[in-house]
């Protein structure tokens, strides 16, 4: 079965600030996006990668396509993450059986995790990594606690999220007017209960400058 990846790199990083989207900033001697691209490139399970970037960053897209042989196509993403993923799915329609969707601002994925997710999707249809909540979780409205959620049932979801292609494509088609915050929700709405693989907290998304400082420390200390 053919497996492809969609690498979402079209975010402008409004919460992060600055003129350069965070996925194109350098961590030591390479861009943040290159860390995850290296893992997808190395995996024997991955047959091709579609890269979605913001307008104005064509030179970076061309550079990455030249550097990584499995990047088969690049294009512009949309205004919202969901628009970007939908564009990637349209590009890959009819080209693969399984698709892995990953946020390029998560540099610290492992080959072991990626291939475990792909292997498990054969029987579970939709699989994603996640971490169990350590802190007590409150549901808050307008700055006031409404209730406390059971921590033992709370999981913080990461990427890559892996799907049978036809399933996630159908979810995006049926709920195309929704702007869910992750891709799992599109198949959950179809009645699927995705499988979660417990993963390391190091697979965090770089969203703020504080996150970047942590990522820099991880790389500088040789932990990655």
Swiss-Prot record:
Query: What's the short name of a Pfam family annotated to this entry?
Result: IspD
- UniProt site (Positions MEP for the nucleophilic attack): 151, 205
Superkingdom as given in the UniProt entry = Bacteria
Known pathway: Isoprenoid biosynthesis; isopentenyl diphosphate biosynthesis via DXP pathway; isopentenyl diphosphate from 1-deoxy-D-xylulose 5-phosphate: step 2/6
Transmembrane portions of the chain: none
InterPro entries cross-referenced by the UniProt entry: IspD, IspD/TarI, IspD/TarI_cytidylyltransf_bact, Nucleotide-diphossugar_trans
Give the reactions, separated by semicolons, that this protein catalyses.
2-C-methyl-D-erythritol 4-phosphate + CTP + H(+) = 4-CDP-2-C-methyl-D-erythritol + diphosphate
Enzyme class at the top of the EC tree? transferase
Swiss-Prot/TrEMBL keywords: Isoprene biosynthesis, Nucleotidyltransferase, Transferase
Which residues does the annotation list for site: Transition state stabilizer? Answer: 15, 22
Look up keyword Transferase and say if it applies: yes
GO annotation (BP), single: isopentenyl diphosphate biosynthetic process, methylerythritol 4-phosphate pathway
Would the keyword Oxidoreductase be found if you checked this record's keyword annotation? no
Annotated GO MF terms: 2-C-methyl-D-erythritol 4-phosphate cytidylyltransferase activity
Name the job this protein performs. Catalyzes the formation of 4-diphosphocytidyl-2-C-methyl-D-erythritol from CTP and 2-C-methyl-D-erythritol 4-phosphate (MEP).
- Stated family: Belongs to the IspD/TarI cytidylyltransferase family. IspD subfamily.
* PANTHER family per the UniProt record, alphabetical: 2-C-METHYL-D-ERYTHRITOL 4-PHOSPHATE CYTIDYLYLTRANSFERASE, CHLOROPLASTIC
What protein name is recorded for this chain?
2-C-methyl-D-erythritol 4-phosphate cytidylyltransferase
Show the taxonomic lineage. Bacteria, Bacillati, Bacillota, Bacillota incertae sedis, Caldicellulosiruptorales
